[in-house]
Amino acid sequence: MAISQGKSTRLPSGARNVANRGKRKAELGRDPAETRVDEKRLKKIRTRGGNEKLRLATANKMNLTDPATGKSQVVDVLGVIENSANPNYVRRNIITKGAIVETPEGNAKVTSRPGQDGVLNGILI
């Protein structure tokens, strides 16, 4: 069944809200990207207007910036240490924005949205 991002069928009181129209294609949603730690793999998604969005399916390298010096470098991602989005994402090595990942330089916080941007950026913490 399709993922819909339309209005709820329930009112705040719990009463049933009778829709005066059906679902629209513009209200369709998609499954989350759930970027994992592995060899880099991108997914192309067709978006509104025929444009394309790149989703990062898997990644093992990230652009890491040291806030103290302002220098950036590409480093390996060893694993996910903490993810406030979902505790189960740590076990499954899923990277989202705000996740703490382990790198050879130290722990890093992910600042990009890998499922939206198609790139993995982070800052050293």
UniProtKB/Swiss-Prot annotation:
Which spans does this entry mark as compositional bias, Basic and acidic residues? 25-38
Question: What domain of life?
Answer: Archaea
Region labeled Disordered — which residues?
1-38
Going by the UniProt record, its keywords in alphabetical order are:
Ribonucleoprotein, Ribosomal protein
Q: Known InterPro entries for this protein?
A: Ribosomal_eS8 (IPR001047), Ribosomal_eS8_CS (IPR018283), Ribosomal_protein_eS8_arc (IPR020919), Ribosomal_Se8/biogenesis_NSA2 (IPR022309)
Gene Ontology cellular-component terms listed: ribonucleoprotein complex; ribosome
Gene3D superfamilies reported for this sequence: 2.40.10.310
Query: Which CDD domains does the UniProt record give?
Result: Ribosomal_S8e
Keyword Heme included in the entry's annotation: no
Q: Which Pfam families match?
A: Ribosomal_S8e (PF01201)
UniProt keyword annotation of Ribonucleoprotein present? yes
Q: Which GO terms describe its biological process?
A: translation
Quaternary context: Part of the 30S ribosomal subunit.
| Family the UniProt entry places it in | Belongs to the eukaryotic ribosomal protein eS8 family.
Official protein name in the record: Small ribosomal subunit protein eS8
